[in-house]
């Protein structure tokens, strides 16, 4: 992986699960990596993260390259590093490619199979 891969993965964790527990952060990281390993998605982490309409924060271009600060960023960065260097995974999410916050109901969710809920996110696989 590159420094840019690490930065993009950490940014995704931070914006999608920055206030979640470590397990919630790891889960978002795993979805990102699962997508990277799927032929349905781009072939590098930054392209997966910035793929149009995939992660809501990434639709705001002003957030793409700013470097966050604070304990949630530090935790997100540490988890991204653990995932990329050690392959840390969340049990039960190996086939999951989708999730959403529990306070929204996206149209695509009815076409998926829920796998688990971690923190405020519901994780899915395809039917």
What residues fall within each predicted segment?
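Bacterial extracytoplasmic/cell-wall-associated proteins, especially those involved in peptidoglycan
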Residues: 1-127
